[in-house]
Swiss-Prot record:
GO terms for biological process: protein ubiquitination. A zinc finger (RING-type) spans 411-450. One of its GO terms (cellular component) is cytoplasm. The keyword rRNA-binding does not apply. ANK repeats lie at residues 6-35, 39-69, 75-104. Residues 277-341, 356-402 are annotated as: Disordered. GO terms for molecular function: ubiquitin-protein transferase activity; zinc ion binding. Keywords: ANK repeat, Metal-binding, Repeat, Transferase, Ubl conjugation pathway, Zinc, Zinc-finger. It comes from Arabidopsis thaliana (Mouse-ear cress). Its EC number is 2.3.2.27. It catalyses: S-ubiquitinyl-[E2 ubiquitin-conjugating enzyme]-L-cysteine + [acceptor protein]-L-lysine = [E2 ubiquitin-conjugating enzyme]-L-cysteine + N(6)-ubiquitinyl-[acceptor protein]-L-lysine. Residues 304-317 have a biased composition (Polar residues). The gene is XBAT35. This is Putative E3 ubiquitin-protein ligase XBAT35.
Length: 462
């Protein structure tokens, strides 16, 4: 007699039959939703490969199937990869609405968005970009020789669809890299231009100028072999200034004089999403711990407040994120006096913006002029050696406490998940995303200072 089939295999077979009721019955009897065939396909992956199995895919997701189940091998990946490859727009939207990660790379180093572009499914490309973009909209792109812009700028511009999206990465703990994508029309799946923003500089229009355009310069260097030869020649002879090949893109708002759209575009290039339409993947962590009970929240808040009162230095520390210097020059403007805008961002990823009350004396007119005209000077780092106590001499009670800088501590409420969310507007990094959202929904206030929480933002550390 042949080997008896498992309930998971029977459930897998019911997917190909389109039998949703049979799937529910087998799941109640213990059928495994993550059973894999010889090719590594789960029931959900199989359902996402056929447009006629949309209801089956919806049933599997409702029963708890893993929307990010990974199938190794060429032309494989997550359920979202398979749906994007076949142009199943409704299935793609279903997966995205239930937490599918659109930035996962398959074994071919492609995200679902890149798979849809290669296959030419513009509807799927628009659906994924709408879900993850920091900016999207019609703009005017200037082309042709630069000197002709002075004489006939309108004749040398064309209307293009511009999107700023994060790229995929093998390491989800690193900040996301951003790229600028330009399409000739909404019907195009393949972009006309793709520029990596972590290798580019943004030249914003100055406030006193009437020119409402922005230029992005790609400072990608010459290939490594030629650069190596140049360095060898420079070391043996007289040094010459190296000329770097540049790619320039110049944009203006689709409606002349629309400074608000231009500001949103410039902010998105720096990693700041639009305030009214932030990307969905920035609003919640991909895998959040279960919400704690009300008693646990209350105990955690009391313990956090007690710790803060005993250590007043924590009250004045607003940890927003670590910033790193860019490899090339960047243009920055000082925030208006009266409010300090803190922005944790480096040239390789997405930062978080939050406004807080000023913690330093206001800038004078001379200081503001210096900031506008010259580079920003950051405080120097004290490299004086510090005597630290050994691990054996530390008291045992400090093992589970949060570090003073708040960067690597755990949640002060559930004491389980990492402290990865910030309260707005007070700026305290007080806990994990799940706990702080629960506190905000109950209007309990910040666990550190009891201030009202207007928004909870997830931090992406460098």
């Amino acid at each position: 007699m042949g080997q008896q089939q498992s309930k998971g295999e029977l459930l897998y077979q019911q997917v190909s039959y389109g039998n949703s009721e049979g799937i529910r019955a087998l799941h109640r009897d213990g059928g495994d939703l993550e059973w894999m065939d010889r090719e590594g396909k789960t029931p959900l992956i199989l359902a996402c490969m056929n447009s006629e199995l949309f209801d089956v895919a919806k049933t599997l997701i409702e029963l708890g199937s893993n929307v990010n189940a990974y199938r190794p091998g060429r032309h494989a990946g997550t359920p979202l990869h398979h749906a994007a490859k076949r142009g199943l727009e409704n299935t793609v939207k279903l997966l995205l609405s239930h937490g599918a990660n659109p930035l996962v790379l398959n074994d071919d180093c492609q995200t679902p968005l890149e798979v849809a572009r290669v296959k030419g499914f513009s509807n799927v490309v628009r659906a994924i970009e709408k879900h993850i973009c920091l900016f999207s909209g019609w703009m005017r792109e200037f082309y042709g020789p630069t000197f002709l812009d002075l004489f006939a700028p309108q004749l040398l511009s064309r209307r293009v669809w511009v999107v700023i999206v994060p790229t995929g990465s093998r390491n989800p703990t690193k900040p996301f890299k951003l790229e600028l994508v330009v399409y000739a029309s909404l019907q195009d799946a393949q972009p006309r231009t793709v520029m990596p923003l972590w290798k580019a500089n943004l030249e914003e229009p100055k406030a006193k100028q009437s020119d409402t355009s922005v230029m992005i310069v790609d400072n990608s260097t010459i290939p490594s072999r030629r650069m190596k030869k140049r360095r060898v020649c420079a070391s043996h002879g007289r040094r010459r200034p190296q000329v770097v090949r540049q790619t320039r893109l110049k944009f203006a708002p689709s409606t002349e004089g629309d400074s608000q759209q231009l500001k949103w575009f410039c902010d998105a290039c720096k990693g700041i999403p639009q305030p009214m339409h932030p990307p969905v993947f920035l609003q919640a962590p991909p895998s959040a711990p279960p919400p704690p009970s009300e008693d646990g929240l209350a105990m955690g808040m009391n313990a956090s407040l007690h710790t803060t009162m005993s250590d007043p230095s924590n009250l004045n520390h607003h940890s927003i994120g670590q910033a790193s210097s860019s490899s090339g020059p960047s243009s920055s403007t000082a925030p208006p006096s009266g409010k300090a805008s803190a922005f944790g961002f480096n040239s390789h990823g997405i930062g978080i913006v939050l406004e807080s009350s000023p913690s330093a004396p206001p800038l004078t007119d001379d200081d503001i002029a210096t900031v506008d005209d010259g580079p920003i000077h950051y405080p120097s780092i004290d490299s004086t050696p510090v005597d630290l106590p050994s691990a054996a001499s530390l008291p045992a009670s400090t093992e589970g406490e949060r570090k003073e800088d708040g960067n690597t501590g755990t949640c002060a409420i559930c004491l389980d998940a990492p402290s990865e969310a910030v309260c707005v507007p007070c700026g305290h990094v007080a806990g994990c995303m799940s706990c702080l959202k629960e506190i905000k929904s109950k209007n309990w206030g910040c666990p550190v200072c009891r201030a009202k929480i207007d928004q909870v933002i997830k931090l992406y550390r460098v």
